């Protein structure tokens, strides 16, 4: 639960009576409690680092890249290679890794590359193999027995009341015995 600090003149407006809260509020603190630990001084009064503080060999302002140093087109944060060809995926990853300064900058990118590209030539070969297999399997003739719906001329049989039978259901006639 959040802590509430005293705001003096504004305190009355936020009391539970005026806010019409149904639950009592958490009691407020008059002063902030002290934290554990201590602050380590690393600079003198002029803002210069003390001699005991280790200095970075890199740029003292960090690796921030300003707007004018960024490329015109910024790659996306998440790239999926699943629906791409191998050549397209290779050119996309090459474009992402083309600017190493942008990848190393503190405000730079860490694009997430997901999936594996597919090769359309291998897909065509797989389709041809599956087509030839289905043709070889379909050589044996399949005999379909005559369905009862084929003899619609005989009045002795009941008509189907199912709507998918191709006609609207009519009154049922009992079978003649």
From Swiss-Prot:
The keyword Cell membrane applies. Residues 113-177 are annotated as: Disordered. Expressed in airway epithelial cells. Residues 115-124 have a biased composition (Basic and acidic residues). One of its GO terms (cellular component) is apical plasma membrane. Keywords: Cell membrane, Cell projection, Cilium, Cilium biogenesis/degradation, Cytoplasm, Cytoskeleton, Flagellum, Membrane. It comes from the Eukaryota. Its main location: cytoplasm. GO terms for biological process: cilium organization; flagellated sperm motility. Residues 132-163 have a biased composition (Polar residues). Transmembrane segments: none annotated. InterPro entries: Fltp (IPR038797). Microtubule inner protein (MIP) part of the dynein-decorated doublet microtubules (DMTs) in cilia axoneme. Acts as a regulator of cilium basal body docking and positioning in mono- and multiciliated cells. Regulates basal body docking and cilia formation in multiciliated lung cells. Regulates kinocilium positioning and stereocilia bundle morphogenesis in the inner ear. Belongs to the Flattop family. Microtubule inner protein component of sperm flagellar doublet microtubules. Interacts with DLG3. This is Protein Flattop. The gene is CFAP126.
């Amino acid at each position: 639960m959040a802590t509430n600090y005293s705001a003096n003149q504004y305190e009355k407006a936020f009391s539970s009576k005026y806010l019409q809260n149904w639950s009592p509020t958490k009691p407020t603190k008059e002063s902030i409690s002290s934290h554990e630990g201590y602050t380590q001084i690393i600079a003198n009064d002029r803002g210069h680092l003390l001699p005991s503080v280790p200095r970075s060999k890199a740029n003292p302002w960090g690796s921030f890249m300003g707007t004018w140093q960024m490329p015109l087109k910024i790659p996306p944060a998440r790239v999926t290679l699943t629906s791409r060809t191998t050549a397209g995926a290779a050119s996309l990853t090459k474009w992402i890794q083309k600017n190493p300064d942008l990848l190393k900058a503190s405000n730079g990118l860490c694009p997430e590359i997901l999936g594996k590209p597919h090769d359309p030539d291998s897909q065509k070969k797989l389709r041809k193999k599956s087509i030839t297999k289905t043709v070889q399997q379909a050589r044996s003739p399949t005999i379909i027995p005559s369905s009862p719906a084929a003899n619609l001329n005989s009045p002795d049989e009941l008509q189907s009341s199912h709507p998918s039978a191709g006609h609207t259901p009519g009154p049922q006639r009992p079978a003649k015995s």
